[in-house]
Amino acid sequence: MRNLLNQIIEEIAGPIVLLDESFSNETISDKNLSNSRFYKCEFKNIVFDTVIFRKSEFSQCRFQNCQILGSDLTRVEFGNTSFTSCEFKQVDLSGSLFTNAQFSETKFEEILLIGLILSDLKIKTTTFHDLEFSKTYPVRIHKLKKVRKVSNLNSFQEILADFYFE
């Protein structure tokens, strides 16, 4: 079914809860999906443009060839979620949590990372440019029960090198 995700968003007109759904080849623009829950969902070739996902949750989801542009992902939780060939551009990830997430061939550009928490990541061929950090609320990176606080790009990339896989 074409534009299934857009149809669901229009019908519900508020926070949505989705389980075991698959979406492809859609553009979602100027929507507020705050407090939504996505479980075991697959997103292929989806463009999220100026979408508010504040306080939403993605658990065991897969994103492939997706673009997340100019969007608000503050305090969003991503658990056991994978991103392959995706692009995050001009996105606010402040206060968000990525646990057991996997990034492969993904780009991050012009990203706000205030208070972001990263835990047990797997990263492959992923690039980071124009990231904004905070010394007051640094990025916290967890690995094997050790926590590192990061407030600049050099230390961020140095620590993330430990998460790269072949």
Language-model region placement:
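Tandem repeat scaffolds
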Residues: 1-166
